[in-house]
């Protein structure tokens, strides 16, 4: 119940979801699931110190994916992207932590794996841009929209992270 209240509060007052309470949406794409990289990806975010607040394995509908990627509708690869994302299971996740949107983008690496440095998820595990393993929100605003698309408020778990005092001042 308290988490539901906090989620409603965060939607009414977006500035409340900054700092250590900032959230981002990540999705391991079908190639990442098929290649059995979900655990490795989760491990990297946990080791960084972020808190997992939601996770589910889903077969995304084309309708959901068209809404998720609406801003790319005019791009030539849009149709292929939607079909690809609907071609297999996706692991949808919400992570929470200080500056999690920006930091998760750095952990993921450049959209084009050729531009992603070693040590990033795409730099270590991807070869081509069409199969780049993972989606990560590109802004706090996008994260809010994407989280609301993929998760109901009651699916976002509020829990006390015992390691928090070792991570934040």
UniProtKB/Swiss-Prot annotation:
Keywords carried by this UniProt record: ATP-binding, Cell projection, Cytoplasm, Cytoskeleton, Kinase, Magnesium, Membrane, Metal-binding, Mitochondrion, Mitochondrion outer membrane, Nucleotide metabolism, Nucleotide-binding, Transferase
Enzyme nomenclature, EC number: 2.7.4.6
Domain of life (superkingdom): Eukaryota
Cofactor: Mg(2+)
Gene Ontology cellular-component terms listed: ciliary basal body; cytoplasm; cytosol; mitochondrial outer membrane; mitochondrion
GO MF annotation terms: ATP binding; metal ion binding; nucleoside diphosphate kinase activity
GO terms, biological process: apoptotic process; CTP biosynthetic process; DNA repair; GTP biosynthetic process; mitochondrial fusion; nucleoside triphosphate biosynthetic process; UTP biosynthetic process
Short name of one Pfam family: NDK
Keyword Membrane: yes
Effect of residue 13 to A: Lacks phosphatidic acid binding activity. Decreases NME3 enrichement at the mitochondrial contact interface
Topology of the protein relative to the lipid bilayer: Peripheral membrane protein
Cellular location(s): Mitochondrion outer membrane; Cytoplasm; Cytoplasm, Cytoskeleton, Cilium basal body
Catalytic activity, reaction form: a 2'-deoxyribonucleoside 5'-diphosphate + ATP = a 2'-deoxyribonucleoside 5'-triphosphate + ADP; a ribonucleoside 5'-diphosphate + ATP = a ribonucleoside 5'-triphosphate + ADP
Active site (UniProt): 135 (pros-phosphohistidine intermediate)
Binding sites annotated in the UniProt record for ADP: 29, 105, 111, 122, 129, 132
Illness the protein is tied to: A substitution in the initiation codon of the NME3 gene substitution (p.Met1Val), resulting in lack of full protein expression has been found in a female infant with an early-onset fatal neurodegenerative disorder.
Family, per entry: Belongs to the NDK family.
Protein name, as recorded: Nucleoside diphosphate kinase 3
Organism annotation: Homo sapiens
UniProt lineage: Eukaryota, Metazoa, Chordata, Craniata, Vertebrata
């Amino acid at each position: 119940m308290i988490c539901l209240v906090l989620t409603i509060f965060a939607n009414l007052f977006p500035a409340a979801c900054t700092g250590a309470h900032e959230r981002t949406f990540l999705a391991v794409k079908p190639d990442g699931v098929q290649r059995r990289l979900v655990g490795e990806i989760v491990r990297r975010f946990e080791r960084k110190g972020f808190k997992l607040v939601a996770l589910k394995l889903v077969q995304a509908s084309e309708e959901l994916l068209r809404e998720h990627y609406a801003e790319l509708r005019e791009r030539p690869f849009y149709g292929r992207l939607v079909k690809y994302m609907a071609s297999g299971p996706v692991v949808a996740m919400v992570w929470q932590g200080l500056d999690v949107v920006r930091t998760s983008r750095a952990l993921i690496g450049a959209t084009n794996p050729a531009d992603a440095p070693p040590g990033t998820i795409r730099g270590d595990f991807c070869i081509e841009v069409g199969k780049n393993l993972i989606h990560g929100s590109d802004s706090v605003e996008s994260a809010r929209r994407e989280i609301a698309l993929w998760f109901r408020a009651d699916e976002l778990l509020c829990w006390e992270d015992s390691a928090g005092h070792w991570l934040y001042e």
